[in-house]
């Protein structure tokens, strides 16, 4: 029996709806059970109406606080263990880093890392920009 589960990990729901909802719909049409772990703002009804299983996750889009990131990592590991997906699709830098670590801990071998959202890195003149 094959495990036809995909889990998307994205830092905020509106970004997923804007950039990855079409991919999720196609996977559902192919018979996959599709999950989304994300920070929920105002897109939950669109996500659920599409047929995705939504897992609320608090993840800041910026910042490098160790304790906050550690709490987020633990929450991601719990979701990965609960869902046990065949494939995780990690979108944007923070989900790629934390989701990649969580995938190692949970022995998920199917990992897609989609780097996007780098435009803001060119707007800041501080330590995190340029």
Task: Show which residues each predicted segment covers.
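An amphipathic, basic-hydrophobic alpha-helix
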Residues: 59-87, 97-105, 130
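Short His-centered aromatic/hydrophobic patch
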Residues: 90-96, 115
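Extreme N-terminal starter segment of soluble prokaryotic enzymes
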Residues: 2-6
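Helix C-cap/helix->beta junction micro-motif
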Residues: 30, 50, 83, 106-107
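Short beta-strand scaffold positions
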Residues: 38, 89-90
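A short, histidine- and acid-enriched strand-loop-helix "catalytic/donor-clamping" loop
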Residues: 10-17, 61-64, 105-129
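N-terminal strand-loop element at the rim of the active site
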Residues: 9-68
